């Protein structure tokens, strides 16, 4: 059942008024593949635009807070925690893991996915002058806790 459609098939924001406030958490990831020398520049702090990981982390946090401005039917949420972690993966990729939490009436999956996506886009933006062939991939939900639909964890 598509929850964002009314009985006439029109898009609407889901009414969560009667839903109980519960603790909710979601974790998402994204990867940015790049040339090994691009990753080396980032890791060694030699990028001319500054600390790529720090800027991407802040962008991801800000994006999570702005999700309802970007995704039309998302509820504006009072997030209680947003964490964005970036790490080198092998010799040619950055892995981004975003985790969002709140006590509320609706989940935070879109906020976690948005945080990971925008952090990846920020890496691309900062590094495109040296590596136009970067690929953003594997944007996905890793885990969701809380709410009526219960626990979800991606298969390893």
Swiss-Prot record:
UniProt keyword Lyase present: yes
GO MF entries: cyclic pyranopterin monophosphate synthase activity
The entry's keywords: Lyase, Molybdenum cofactor biosynthesis
Reaction(s) the record says it catalyses: (8S)-3',8-cyclo-7,8-dihydroguanosine 5'-triphosphate = cyclic pyranopterin phosphate + diphosphate
One of the GO biological process terms: Mo-molybdopterin cofactor biosynthetic process
Pathway where it operates: Cofactor biosynthesis; molybdopterin biosynthesis
UniProt family annotation: Belongs to the MoaC family.
Entry-linked HAMAP family: MoaC_B
Binding partners and assembly: Homohexamer; trimer of dimers.
Protein name: Cyclic pyranopterin monophosphate synthase
Organism per entry: Pseudomonas putida (strain W619)
């Amino acid at each position: 059942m598509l929850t964002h459609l009314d009985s006439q098939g029109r898009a609407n924001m889901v009414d969560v008024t009667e839903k109980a406030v519960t603790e909710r958490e979601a974790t998402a990831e994204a990867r940015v593949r790049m040339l090994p020398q691009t990753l080396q520049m980032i890791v060694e702090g030699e990028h001319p635009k500054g600390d790529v990981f720090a800027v991407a982390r802040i962008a991801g946090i800000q994006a999570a807070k702005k999700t309802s401005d970007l995704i039309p039917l998302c509820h504006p949420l009072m997030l209680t925690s947003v964490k964005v972690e970036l790490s080198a993966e092998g010799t040619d990729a950055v892995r981004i893991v975003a985790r969002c939490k709140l006590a509320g009436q609706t989940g935070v999956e879109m906020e976690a996915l948005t945080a990971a996506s925008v952090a990846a886009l920020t890496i691309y933006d900062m590094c495109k002058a040296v590596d136009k062939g970067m690929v953003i991939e594997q944007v996905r939900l890793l885990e969701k806790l809380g709410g009526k639909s219960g626990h979800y964890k991606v298969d390893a």
